Amino acid sequence: MKTAKGKDKVKTTKEALKPVDDRKVGKRKAPAEKPTKRETRKEKKAKKDPNKPKRAPSAFFVFLEDFRVTFKKENPNVKAVSAVGKAGGQKWKSMSQAEKAPYEEKAAKRKAEYEKQMDAYNKNLEEGSDESEKSRSEINDEDEASGEEELLEKEAAGDDEEEEEEEDDDDDDDEEED
């Protein structure tokens, strides 16, 4: 089929042969609702476990710990972290293997400690998964029940001990104010 050239020419394309209702002239699709990049990052990023052991530093970072102290003594006016890092990197590159050896030994010891801590941490996670079979509400109910029993036992033992403790606490407060 022929295509139209110019404004006044008749269109003989497939679009021209379709009825007007079927044409997508002037119609736009609504933009798809996609989550923003920030939202997807937040969803993908897993929450960090505060009980997980911190990863062992490399030999360079062990060196950098010592280097920071000496660099700050020699250059008290330089406060930029990047300057300390750059100077430390240059010094590390210029050091021989013999000079790096003590830092590599410290890093190896820390790595061994980290691996032991991770083994213990992973064992605790495995043991913790057994407890997850119970619902958390049942666990909380058991804790609350045992706490109530302890309170009842204390009250039965006598209120004299609690009163003495409160008096001792009041005396401590008076000393802090002076």
Swiss-Prot record:
Write out the ranges of the annotated region (Disordered): 1-59, 75-178
> For bias kind Basic and acidic residues, which ranges apply?
1-52, 101-118
Q: Which residues bind DNA?
A: 53-122
Q: Where is the composition biased (Acidic residues)?
A: 140-178
Q: Where does the signal sequence lie?
A: none
Please give the record's induction comment. Down-regulated by salt stress.
Tell me a Gene Ontology molecular-function term this record carries.
DNA-binding transcription factor activity
**What tissue specificity does the UniProt entry give?**
Expressed in cotyledons, roots, stems, leaves and flowers (excluding pedicels).
The phenotype of cells or organisms lacking this gene is: Slightly delayed and reduced germination rate. Reduced root length. Enhanced sensitivity to methyl methanesulfonate (MMS).
Q: What is the predominant subcellular site recorded for this chain? A: nucleus
Q: Does the keyword Ribonucleoprotein apply?
A: no
According to its record, what are the GO cellular component terms? chromatin; nucleus
Residues bearing PTM Phosphoserine: 137, 146
Localization per Swiss-Prot or TrEMBL: Nucleus
Keywords, A to Z?
Answer: DNA-binding, Nucleus, Phosphoprotein
GO terms for biological process? chromatin organization
Pfam families referenced in this protein's UniProt entry, alphabetically: HMG_box (PF00505)
Report if keyword Transport is assigned. Answer: no
For this protein, the record's PANTHER family field holds: HIGH MOBILITY GROUP B PROTEIN 1, HIGH MOBILITY GROUP B PROTEIN 4-RELATED
Q: What does this protein do?
A: Binds preferentially double-stranded DNA. Modulates general plant growth and stress tolerance. Confers sensitivity to salt and genotoxic (methyl methanesulfonate, MMS) stresses.
Which protein family is named in the record? Answer: Belongs to the HMGB family.
Protein name, as recorded: High mobility group B protein 1
